[in-house]
Regions:
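Acidic, PIN/NYN-like endoribonuclease modules and their adjacent C-terminal/linker elements
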Residues: 1-6, 110-111, 115-140
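Short secondary-structure boundary segments
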Residues: 46-47, 84, 106, 125-126
Length: 140
């Protein structure tokens, strides 16, 4: 079975890549280098972009947060816009999930990835076992 060349980028993947003092910075650099070399299609959503923007604005600098948005506009990263059915599905997932640690942003990310046929998430956070999604790992 062929491995899909689609990756969904989470907040932790972006933040660790941008923040040079982040403990996972070198790992995220390797992720993005690999994605470029192997010509992966990269996806993220508007909620994740807002979270990353707020992180950069508060933790690093407002001007870098603005530059981040400019870079996203010029990049090949596909931005997924959740519609009403995506939000309702995420809310149902959130309400029906057995763990109270699932956040709305994680639920919407899982729903959007599942509906777009994206099976791997680039993340350094715990990935809840939803819809058969898996965390991306660099091949050895």
């Amino acid at each position: 079975m062929a491995i899909s060349k689609k990756i969904y980028l989470s907040q932790s993947a972006f933040c660790s890549f941008i923040d040079r003092v982040h403990p996972k910075h070198y790992y995220s650099q390797a992720f993005f280098r690999y994605f470029g070399q192997e010509e992966y299609a990269l996806f993220t959503d508007t909620i994740t972009l807002n979270q990353v923007y707020n992180y950069i604005y508060k933790e690093i600098s407002p001007s870098l947060a603005r530059d981040f948005l400019k870079t996203i506009v010029l990049s090949n990263i596909n931005i997924i816009y959740p519609d009403q059915s995506d939000i309702k599905a995420a809310l149902k997932t959130l309400i029906g999930y057995q763990s109270s640690e699932l956040t709305f942003s994680d639920a919407i990310m899982a729903v959007l990835a599942n509906r777009r046929g994206i099976s791997q998430i680039a993340t350094f956070d715990y990935l809840h076992p939803l819809f058969g999604l898996s965390a991306f790992f660099l091949p050895i």
